[in-house]
Regions:
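Metal-dependent amide/peptide-bond hydrolase catalytic core
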Residues: 1-96
């Protein structure tokens, strides 16, 4: 699962990228194979919430449903978060 040191460094970056709109959940591997990579390489896995703000999460269609709907504004946040996390990681690796 997520490396604690990487997570401690990434969460503040995600909070800046999402203007503080970050929810920390219990650990979950869901059905992602990414967790296997984290056995060998320290990293951090996170979910990007894409359900529209005016829709209850409980009523949202799941990923593989033909009714799945993505609030495309969330994609901008996701790209910003990944870019900022990458820049943060590269800057920190120069000083480590």
């Amino acid at each position: 699962m997520n490396d604690e040191r990487v997570t401690a460094r990434v969460v503040p970056v995600l909070e800046r990228a999402a203007n503080g709109d970050v929810v920390l959940n219990e650990r979950s591997g869901a059905s992602e194979d990414f967790s296997f990579m984290l056995n060998d390489v320290p990293g951090q896995f996170f979910f990007l919430g894409v359900v529209p703000r005016d829709q209850e999460l409980a009523t949202a269609a799941p990923n593989h449903s033909p009714n799945f709907f993505v609030d495309e504004k969330a994609l901008i946040v996701g790209v910003r978060a990944l870019a900022m996390a990458t820049v943060n990681y590269l800057a920190a690796s120069k000083t480590d």
